[in-house]
Amino acid sequence: MTQQITLIKDKILSDNYFTLHNITYDLTRKDGEVIRHKREVYDRGNGATILLYNTKKKTVVLIRQFRVATWVNGNESGQLIESCAGLLDNDEPEVCIRKEAIEETGYEVGEVRKLFELYMSPGGVTELIHFFIAEYSDNQRANAGGGVEDEDIEVLELPFSQALEMIKTGEIRDGKTVLLLNYLQTSHLMD
């Protein structure tokens, strides 16, 4: 028997920037027993991320920016090194990531390769992230990057080996970035 889910109630607790739901549902277990659950679910929309890499220079482009959630959770500076990313905002994932790449890193990417889609925190967050990689070259630099309006983003071009080491030292602690760097390493694209 497959599990059956019945929505009992969906109460919106907050919808200031993203939406926080309080969901009550019945879950029929495989053994037939019905269990009532009540959970908070944070709907922040879906997103996309991209890792830019250069096989000739053996470099990657990452960004550093303030992330309030990490600061609240003990990251003293709140600064996080991560891959370029953004919310889809009704765009297709590839359209979104091309816009984000030029806004955040300053690079106008050519061919992009979609790797996979992953839920990053499925216990309470709805977000599905689309993961991409793209090779970049210096002549694709259209502007300085740094984000738009209220963003304060530092663009980092790092040796690939240094970025991998930064995972070990804890300087890179962002899940999507670790996944993309590890993908690049295991795919041997930088060998």
Curated annotation (Swiss-Prot):
| InterPro entries hit by this protein | NDP_pyrophosphatase, NUDIX_hydrolase-like_dom_sf, NUDIX_hydrolase_dom
User: In which residues is Mg(2+) 2 bound?
Assistant: E100, E104, E151
The reported result of mutating K176A is: Decreases catalytic activity rate by a factor of 820 and substrate affinity by at least 2-fold
Q: Which cofactor does it need?
A: Mg(2+)
The record describes the dependence of activity on pH as: Optimum pH is about 8.5.
Q: Name one Pfam family in it.
A: NUDIX
Query: Subunit notes for this chain?
Result: Homodimer.
Give the family per the record. Belongs to the Nudix hydrolase family. NudK subfamily.
Q: Supply the name of the protein.
A: GDP-mannose pyrophosphatase
Query: Which species expresses this protein natively?
Result: Escherichia coli (strain K12)
